[in-house]
Amino acid sequence: MTFKQIAIDGPAGAGKSTVAKKLAALLGYTYVDSGAMYRALTYWALKNDINIHNVEAIVNLCTSIHITFINQDIAVNNQIVNTEIRSPEVNNNVSHIAKIPEVRKHLVSLQKCIALSQNVIMDGRDIGTHVLPDADIKVFLTASTQERAQRRYIELVEKGIQTSLMEVEQGIIQRDQMDSKRQYAPLTQADDAVVIDSTGKSIDAIVEEVLRIFNGKERG
């Protein structure tokens, strides 16, 4: 049996996760937040006082812990870490871990396995170009830096995480630079991806736009 794959890529704060979750619920697909896997590893390293810049230690940690999705929640060794992985500390360190080739190879392998066994909507930075290069639909979702920062700031405040809009915006700018320049699987728009600029658009409007693309593809 062949399963459907929808890949949604884009920079931090573009609305990928929110859009992907809504689409998954509407289509009955499994939602896979690939970025949450890197965040979970980063959080676990920080929690256990492991030096983020110690590549060998991070690789060993990556292959020794169990990162899974439980009813759309992200878990490490069966501990739900949804809120913890969205902290400013994780935001400021996740790119250091995400650029380690051995880490990406291991987590990409897990992501590919998930996509082989069910219909999935997966979001991240390199899904359409590296993880699921043959995805049925590829979307590259973007937005202005200011709007992305505002969205992420509101998200953090609603979760009770103390930060400032300026700190969030600086973190996004730094993340963009690191994601685009990393040597292994950098943030890149797939040649066959549909670009959607979400600046000024509601989540529902973006979801409807992707659904039109999906329905058009299904009709052939």
From Swiss-Prot:
Record keyword ATP-binding present: yes
Record's protein name: Cytidylate kinase
UniProt binding sites for ATP: 10-18
SUPFAM superfamilies: P-loop containing nucleoside triphosphate hydrolases (SSF52540)
Keyword Kinase: yes
Classification via InterPro entries: Cytidylate_kin, Cytidylate_kinase_dom, P-loop_NTPase
Catalytic activity: CMP + ATP = CDP + ADP; dCMP + ATP = dCDP + ADP
Gene name linked to the record: cmk
Pfam families the record matches: Cytidylate_kin
Organism: Alkaliphilus metalliredigens (strain QYMF)
CDD domains per UniProt: CMPK
